[in-house]
Amino acid sequence: MARQNKQEAIYEFIKEQLREKGYPPSVREICNAVELRSTSTVHGHLKRLEEKGVIRRDPTKPRAIEVLEHSIMKKEMVDIPVVGTVTAGKPILAVENIEDTFALPINYVRNKKQLFALKIKGDSMIDTGILDGDLAIVEKNNSVLNGEIVVALLGDRATVKRFFKEKDYIRLQPENETMEPIIVKQCEIIGKVVGVYRKY
């Protein structure tokens, strides 16, 4: 099995069996699936999953395990702010800049620093797959490397470009062959793009 903790593996196996067979696995089947020898260990994991509110069991029945999907979704997702506009001189996450929220898997957010989503306007990054109307998932961070896609503040507007620190200037390179790079002496880097969401 893929490397993951046993509790996660048990939960995923229960969901898989419910999807494929329509009923949950037995404790012995769980043992075999996640490579545990002791049924008491599985019972312990099931008890902890129940305490977390992600499954429900009927102790009078051997296979009565119910997955509480609504609870799972709520526990596994977290909202990040969606920024519609960026105003010079104000924090990126100022209340007046936030238009909405967007749900991301909690594991994704846990491994990053402060995240927000920015609405993309225009087609300057189409060659890298970032299109007008997309939501760019941005990690708030002003320390970036050459070649990374960043959100830079130029005057009173934010722009998403590929960042290059040259000898005497900064080059903000679009990913659109019809557009010229933006050359500036300095600019404020708000963060780097770590993902893109597109609604179909």
UniProtKB/Swiss-Prot annotation:
SUPFAM superfamilies reported for this sequence: LexA/Signal peptidase (SSF51306), Winged helix' DNA-binding domain (SSF46785)
Keywords recorded for this protein, A-Z: Autocatalytic cleavage, DNA damage, DNA repair, DNA replication, DNA-binding, Hydrolase, Repressor, SOS response, Transcription, Transcription regulation
Keyword Transferase appears in the UniProt entry: no
Site (Cleavage): 88-89
Claim: Transcription regulation is one of the keywords in the record: yes
A Pfam family reported for this protein in Swiss-Prot or TrEMBL: Peptidase_S24
Top EC group: hydrolase
Portion annotated as DNA-binding: 27-47
Active site: 124 (for autocatalytic cleavage activity), 161 (for autocatalytic cleavage activity)
Source superkingdom: Bacteria
Recorded family membership: Belongs to the peptidase S24 family.
Subunit architecture: Homodimer.
Protein name: LexA repressor
Source organism: Clostridium tetani (strain Massachusetts / E88)
